[in-house]
């Protein structure tokens, strides 16, 4: 068997990626989230496949087909709630994975980091089009508001919106194409994830100390396979608790009402994992400015390798930047809270302050703290 996995053309790839892969001996549990994201992706594809067998992407039957899945299909309610809450678990793992990358300076592996940003954007697109499919009130109005943002594009905005809608409003054509996108995008994510792994294994993994670990590596199996299995078990346990005991806690009550173009909900908001970006969008009074800020809130991640001037790798020995990093995390939580609040005082003011702080920390404070710490080392 050992000879086979080392010489077989296909098994050799698996062997070099998951069995004999030289891995730093000191990587902590924060490195588990990559494998957890892979598990989340598999769960989402499998549950989504079974949901797609019973779902109909027609405006007249979409809402009732989801109700039919929950009521009449064997374990349909479980599949539906695993899929809906699986998306939340996916984004929790994703945010922690990106946060770990920033904290431990993994962004210096620029190819892996940039593919990761593409993966992040693709996952957000998949979640957005998926949220439209149940065709509830928040699905419909969320789709209307977010797609309508494209009308801010100069000259071609209105044409672009109608082209995406497939008509003059969010309707049957929009739902059908969003279902098609939601079906194909996870497979594109899978392809990008493999490229992400390919680039990671070219350079080798980063580690908590930020030092070169070539002299101290161990095989991935059995050490990290066992460690990953523990993480997977905890993830599945959290997902099952969420899906079985609190299935609707992260959803919106408005989505229990079928979509009605004549009745606007009091407060339109996306799923919780988009609220930080939504708060940044709303904090700018100008429509085009808001859209640009929304896009930049994610694309600014690409600036980390460019703005990094530190002589040390990661934040483990850098107390000044550590304080700024945790302020950044707290600020993100504030943005998430504000995104779910109505557009009125004092929430608008808090949102504007938090949005300015978000960009200031990344563009100004972190590079300045890098310079300060570099000078402290020289003393």
Curated annotation (Swiss-Prot):
PROSITE patterns: CYTB_CTER, CYTB_NTER. It holds the Pfam family Cytochrom_B_C. One of its GO terms (molecular function) is ubiquinol-cytochrome-c reductase activity. The gene is MT-CYB. The chain crosses the membrane at residues 33-53, 77-98, 113-133, 178-198, 226-246, 288-308, 320-340, 347-367. The cytochrome bc1 complex contains 11 subunits: 3 respiratory subunits (MT-CYB, CYC1 and UQCRFS1), 2 core proteins (UQCRC1 and UQCRC2) and 6 low-molecular weight proteins (UQCRH/QCR6, UQCRB/QCR7, UQCRQ/QCR8, UQCR10/QCR9, UQCR11/QCR10 and a cleavage product of UQCRFS1). This cytochrome bc1 complex then forms a dimer. Heme b b562 binds at residues 83, 182. CDD domains: cytochrome_b_C, Cytochrome_b_N. Heme 1 (or BL or b562) is low-potential and absorbs at about 562 nm, and heme 2 (or BH or b566) is high-potential and absorbs at about 566 nm. Keywords: Electron transport, Heme, Iron, Membrane, Metal-binding, Mitochondrion, Mitochondrion inner membrane, Respiratory chain, Transmembrane, Transmembrane helix, Transport, Ubiquinone. The lineage of its organism: Eukaryota, Metazoa, Chordata, Craniata, Vertebrata. A ubiquinone binds at residue 201. One of its GO terms (cellular component) is mitochondrial inner membrane. Component of the ubiquinol-cytochrome c reductase complex (complex III or cytochrome b-c1 complex) that is part of the mitochondrial respiratory chain. The b-c1 complex mediates electron transfer from ubiquinol to cytochrome c. Contributes to the generation of a proton gradient across the mitochondrial membrane that is then used for ATP synthesis. This is Cytochrome b. GO terms for biological process: mitochondrial electron transport, ubiquinol to cytochrome c. The keyword Transmembrane applies. Binds 2 heme b groups non-covalently. Belongs to the cytochrome b family. Gene3D superfamilies: Cytochrome Bc1 Complex, Chain C.
């Amino acid at each position: 068997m050992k000879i086979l996995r080392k010489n077989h053309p296909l098994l050799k790839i698996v062997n070099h990626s998951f069995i004999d892969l030289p891995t730093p001996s000191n990587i902590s549990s924060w490195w588990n989230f990559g494998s957890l994201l892979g598990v989340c992706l598999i769960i989402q594809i499998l549950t989504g496949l079974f949901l797609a067998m019973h779902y109909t992407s027609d405006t007249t039957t979409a809402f009732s087909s989801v109700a039919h899945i929950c009521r009449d299909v064997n374990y349909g309610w479980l599949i539906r709630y695993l899929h809906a809450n699986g998306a939340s678990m996916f984004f929790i793992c994703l945010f922690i994975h990106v946060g770990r990358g920033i904290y431990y300076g993994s962004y210096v592996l620029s190819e892996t980091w940039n593919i990761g940003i593409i993966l992040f954007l693709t996952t957000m697109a998949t979640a957005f089009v998926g949220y439209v499919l149940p065709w509830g009130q928040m699905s419909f109005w969320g789709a209307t508001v977010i797609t309508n943002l494209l009308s801010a594009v100069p000259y071609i905005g209105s044409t672009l919106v109608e082209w995406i809608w497939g008509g003059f409003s969010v309707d049957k054509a929009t739902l059908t194409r969003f279902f098609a996108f939601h079906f194909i995008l996870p497979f594109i994510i899978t392809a990008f994830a493999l490229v992400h792994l390919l680039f990671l294994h070219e350079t080798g993994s980063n580690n908590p100390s930020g030092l070169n670990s070539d002299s101290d590596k161990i095989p991935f199996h059995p050490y990290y396979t066992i460690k990953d299995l523990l993480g997977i078990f905890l993830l599945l346990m959290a997902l099952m608790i969420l899906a079985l005991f609190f299935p609707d806690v992260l959803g919106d009550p408005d989505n229990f009402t079928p979509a009605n173009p004549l009745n606007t909900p009091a407060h339109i908001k996306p799923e919780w994992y988009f609220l930080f970006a939504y708060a940044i969008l709303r904090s700018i009074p100008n429509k085009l400015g808001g859209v640009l800020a929304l896009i930049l809130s994610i694309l600014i991640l690409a600036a980390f390798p460019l703005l990094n001037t530190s002589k040390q790798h990661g934040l483990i020995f850098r107390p000044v930047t550590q304080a700024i990093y945790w302020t950044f995390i707290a600020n993100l939580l504030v943005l998430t809270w504000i995104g779910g609040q109505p557009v009125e005082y004092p929430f608008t003011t808090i949102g504007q302050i938090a949005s300015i702080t978000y960009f200031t920390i990344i563009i100004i404070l972190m590079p300045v703290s890098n310079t300060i710490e570099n000078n402290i080392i020289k003393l």
